[in-house]
C-alpha cells in the first residue's frame, strides 16, 4: 500500500502499482498512502482476529442531480468501475450541476451509469488493518482541492457524522484508514441509484464503425450473481478498471494458502482460525503493504513464526519531503506531460522512492527494534528467531506438503558456490504476496476498437512501460493505444465523433505521473474529465 495510495485495489478502481510484479517483491505499493499503527493486536481468546467492523451509516440522502435511466437508454456516460476514481467523477458531475452548469444542452440531468464488479462499494478492504492511518492529508479528498464548498468534503462528512469538533481535537490531518474508507462509502451512498453493482465490464465496442465516425459504444457487462451478460450503450465511456493482483510466477496459481495482500484482512482469518496457534507465515515484498502485514501477523498471532522475503537488500524509507512530494501536485501533470518519453521515464524512475518498494520510516524503525530484541534475547543466529527478514532473497520453488507449503529461498542472482547454492528451506501455513498490481484491463476491454487506433510509427523508440501508450497487435499491423492530456483515448482522426469517446483513469502513470494511480489528484482530475466529456 502506498503513502499516497488512493484508488481501490480490490475492486474496479484500484491504486496502481507499476505494471507487473518484479521478481519476488515486484516493488509492491510503496508508502505514500498509509502508515501502520504498531500496536495492532487484539485478544479474542482462541478465536482468529476478525476484520474491522464499522458502525451503522446514517446517511440516506441521494444526489438530486444525477438521475436513473432505463437500461436500454443511450447513456451520456458509462463508467467501468466505481472505486474512488469514478466516485470522484460522480462528485464532480454533482458539483458542476449544483453550481448551475448544464452538462447536457437541454439542461436536463445527464444519463449516467456506473458498472462495478464488487457487490458493494469498498476501498482497500483487504488492508483495513487495526491502527493503520492515512499518510495523505484529508484535504486531498473527493472535492476540496477542486471546490472547498462542496458537500463531499471530508470535513462535511465529519460534520454530518457529528464528529467534526472531536476530530479537530485530534490535531491531525491524517485520519484512520477505516475512517477514510467510511468517508468514501458515505460519498458513494449518494450515488447508489446510478450504480449497478455485481457487474463486471467485459468489453467496450464501437457501434457501426464502418459507417463513419463512431457516435456510440456498446459496453458489455457480466452479472456476478447470475452470470448473465447485458449490453449498454453510451456516447462516452470512462474506464477506471483498477489493478489486478500480480503474483510472482514462482508461487502456485490459485492455491488456497497463497493470498495477495489485497485479500489479507478478508481471508487470512478464515485460514488462520486460532489466535494462539503457532502458525508459520511468509510475506513476500519490500513495500509498505508487505511490512504492515509482516508486523500485523506478529501482533494478531503472538505465537506465530513470520518471514519477510524480499529481493532488496534493505527496507528503504519513503521520501515524503515537501519538495519531492510536489510530484503529486495536480499542476505537476502539466509539467510532466509535454516531456519526451525518455525524460518522463527518467523522472518517474528517480521518483520511485516516493511510492514503490519503500516503507514509512517509523515502521522500519519499529521492525528493526523487533529484530534487535530477538538478537539480544535469543541469539545471534537468525535462524533461531521467530520473526525474520530474509533480504536479498528470491523464491526458488514452492511445493505442497500436506496442509503446508514448503518454500525454498536463495540469494538473488546466486551462482553455484563450489557446486552448491546458498539455499534455505522452511514450511509455512500461509503465503501472502504483497507484490503489486497489473494495470492492463483497459487494453483487452477495448479490443474491438483496436483497428480504430493509429498505426505505430516505424523506427520510433517505443517504451515498454506505457510512457507513450501501449502497442497492440491487429490483423492490419501494430497499433498504438494512447491518451491525450485530458485522458481521452487518441483514436485515428475521423473514426470517432467529436462529441463521443473513451477516457482512461488509473493506468496513465507513464504519461501523467505517479499521481495518476493515487488519491492526490482525484478531485481536480475528475473536474477536468467532466469538462472534457461534457465540453464545459
Swiss-Prot record:
Disruption phenotype: Impairs the production of siderophores and leads to slow growth under low iron conditions. Does not affect the ability to infect single, inoculated spikelets, but prevents the spreading from spikelet-to-spikelet through the rachises of wheat spikes.
Details of cofactor binding: Binds 1 FAD per subunit.
Cofactor(s) required, per the database record: FAD
Positions contributing to FAD binding: 116-124, 135, 201, 517-519
Residue sites binding substrate per the record: 140, 325-328, 355, 520
Keywords of this entry: FAD, Flavoprotein, Monooxygenase, NADP, Oxidoreductase
One annotated GO molecular function: ornithine N5-monooxygenase activity
Top EC class, one word: oxidoreductase
Basic residues: compositionally biased ranges: 54-63
Regions of compositional bias (Polar residues) in chain numbering: 1-31
Stored Pfam families: Lys_Orn_oxgnase
One GO term (biological process): intracellular iron ion homeostasis
SUPFAM superfamilies associated with the record: FAD/NAD(P)-binding domain
Stored InterPro entries: FAD/NAD-bd_sf, Lys/Orn_oxygenase
Low complexity biased stretches: 32-46
Gene induction: Expression is induced under iron starvation conditions.
Disordered: region residues: 1-64
Residues binding NADP(+), per UniProt: 286-289, 355-357
EC number: 1.14.13.196
Pathway: Siderophore biosynthesis
Catalytic activity: L-ornithine + NADPH + O2 = N(5)-hydroxy-L-ornithine + NADP(+) + H2O; L-ornithine + NADH + O2 = N(5)-hydroxy-L-ornithine + NAD(+) + H2O
Function noted in UniProt: L-ornithine N(5)-monooxygenase; part of the gene cluster that mediates the biosynthesis of hydroxamate-containing siderophores that play a critical role in virulence. Gibberella zeae produces extracellular coprogen-type siderophores as well as the intracellular siderophore ferricrocin. The role of extracellular siderophores is to supply iron to the fungus during plant infection, and the intracellular ferricrocin is required for intracellular iron distribution and storage with a crucial role in ascus and ascospore development.
Family according to the record: Belongs to the lysine N(6)-hydroxylase/L-ornithine N(5)-oxygenase family.
Quaternary structure annotation from Swiss-Prot or TrEMBL: Homotetramer.
Protein known as: L-ornithine N(5)-monooxygenase
Species this chain originates from: Gibberella zeae (strain ATCC MYA-4620 / CBS 123657 / FGSC 9075 / NRRL 31084 / PH-1) (Wheat head blight fungus)
Gene field: SID1
Amino acid at each position: 500500500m502506498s503513502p499516497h495510495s488512493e484508488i481501490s485495489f480490490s475492486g474496479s478502481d484500484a491504486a496502481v502499482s507499476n505494471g507487473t510484479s518484479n521478481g519476488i517483491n515486484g516493488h509492491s505499493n510503496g508508502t505514500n498512502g498509509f502508515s501502520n499503527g504498531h500496536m495492532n493486536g487484539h485478544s479474542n481468546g482462541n478465536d482468529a482476529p476478525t476484520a474491522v467492523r464499522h458502525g451503522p451509516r446514517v446517511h440516506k440522502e441521494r444526489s438530486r442531480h444525477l438521475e436513473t435511466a432505463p437500461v436500454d437508454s443511450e447513456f451520456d456516460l458509462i463508467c467501468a468501475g466505481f472505486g474512488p476514481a469514478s466516485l470522484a467523477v460522480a462528485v464532480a458531475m454533482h458539483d458542476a450541476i449544483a453550481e448551475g452548469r448544464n452538462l447536457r444542452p437541454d439542461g436536463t440531468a445527464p444519463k449516467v451509469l456506473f458498472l462495478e464488479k464488487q457487490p458493494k462499494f469498498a476501498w482497500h478492504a483487504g488492508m483495513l488493518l487495526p491502527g493503520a492511518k492515512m499518510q495523505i492529508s484529508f484535504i486531498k479528498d473527493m472535492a476540496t482541492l477542486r471546490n472547498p464548498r462542496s458537500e463531499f468534503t471530508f470535513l462535511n462528512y465529519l460534520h454530518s457524522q457529528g464528529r467534526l469538533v472531536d476530530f479537530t481535537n485530534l490535531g491531525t490531518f491524517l485520519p484512520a484508514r477505516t475512517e477514510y474508507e467510511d468517508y468514501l462509502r458515505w460519498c458513494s451512498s449518494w450515488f447508489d441509484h446510478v450504480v449497478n453493482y455485481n457487474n463486471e465490464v467485459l468489453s467496450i465496442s464501437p457501434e457501426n464503425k464502418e459507417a463513419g465516425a463512431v457516435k456510440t459504444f456498446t459496453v458489455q457487462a457480466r452479472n456476478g450473481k447470475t452470470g448473465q451478460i447485458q449490453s449498454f450503450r453510451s456516447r462516452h465511456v470512462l474506464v477506471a478498471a483498477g489493478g489486478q493482483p500480480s503474483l510472482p510466477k514462482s508461487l502456485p496459481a490459485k492455491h488456497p494458502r497463497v493470498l495477495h495482500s489485497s485479500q489479507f484482512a478478508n481471508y487470512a482469518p478464515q485460514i488462520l482460525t486460532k489466535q494462539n496457534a503457532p502458525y508459520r507465515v511468509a510475506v513476500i515484498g519490500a513495500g509498505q503493504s508487505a511490512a504492515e502485514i509482516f508486523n500485523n501477523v506478529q501482533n494478531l498471532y503472538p505465537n506465530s513464526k513470520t518471514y519477510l522475503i524480499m529481493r532488496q537488500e534493505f527496507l528503504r524509507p519513503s521520501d515524503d519531503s515537501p519538495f519531492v512530494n510536489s510530484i503529486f501536485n495536480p499542476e505537476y501533470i502539466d509539467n510532466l506531460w509535454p516531456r519526451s518519453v525518455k525524460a518522463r521515464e527518467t523522472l518517474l524512475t528517480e521518483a520511485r522512492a516516493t511510492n514503490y518498494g519503500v516503507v514509512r520510516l517509523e515502521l522500519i524503525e519499529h521492525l528493526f527494534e523487533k529484530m534487535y530484541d530477538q538478537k539480544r534475547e535469543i541469539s545471534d543466529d537468525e535462524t533461531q528467531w521467530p520473526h525474520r527478514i530474509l533480504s536479498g532473497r528470491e523464491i526458488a520453488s514452492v511445493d505442497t506438503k500436506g496442509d503446508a507449503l514448503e518454500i525454498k529461498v536463495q540469494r538473488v542472482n546466486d551462482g553455484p558456490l563450489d557446486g552448491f547454492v546458498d539455499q534455505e528451506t522452511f514450511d509455512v501455513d500461509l503465503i501472502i504476496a504483497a507484490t503489486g498490481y497489473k494495470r492492463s484491463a483497459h487494453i483487452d476491454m477495448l479490443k474491438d476498437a483496436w483497428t480504430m487506433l493509429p498505426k505505430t510509427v516505424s523506427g520510433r523508440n517505443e517504451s515498454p512501460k506505457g510512457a507513450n501508450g501501449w502497442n497492440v497487435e491487429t490483423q492490419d499491423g501494430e497499433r498504438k493505444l494512447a491518451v491525450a492530456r485530458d485522458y481521452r483515448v487518441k483514436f485515428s482522426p475521423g473514426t470517432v465523433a467529436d462529441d463521443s469517446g473513451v477516457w482512461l483513469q488509473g493506468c496513465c502513470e507513464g504519461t501523467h505521473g505517479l499521481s495518476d494511480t493515487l488519491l492526490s489528484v482525484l478531485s481536480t482530475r475528475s473536474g477536468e474529465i467532466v469538462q472534457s466529456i461534457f465540453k464545459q
